[in-house]
């Protein structure tokens, strides 16, 4: 069951990885009349806004199921991440893909599929739910790093870096809970083990502070 659920999630993640790049490459990278952003930067902003919603929505629902404080605490942080991205969307006069969508509803089909897969696994057990937290945070870090590489705007990079910092802290929290439950070291689920170990072997960060 575990191998099957992980395989399903990896397929969903593969689709999610290609979604923003496909959308960006599928249209001209010209500057728009409404913003100073490239089409790639716009696509990434829209995608990241909904990806943070995936995290928030999953954590809210998993808290309802398992009553683990880590889900409630991090869901609140994910709302802050969503708010930061909404501020950028408004600054650059871009439409909000999350507008009007209830918990568990997404405009991007790849993210809808990812949410559904994560929820399916997260309902299996408290252990699976915590692993879902690790999957989400590792995925966020991978996607944020890619968006930073594709961005040429300081304000966007600053926001992404702050979110990346938050995701590192969230991964530390989920890893701590998993290690306490299993007695085993945290195993990477999306990133390389080397990347994950570097994060887990460093202390919690004060994000957004210089």
Stretches found by the model and what they are:
Residues 26-210:
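All-alpha RGS (Regulator of G-protein Signaling) helical domain and cognate RGS-like helical scaffolds
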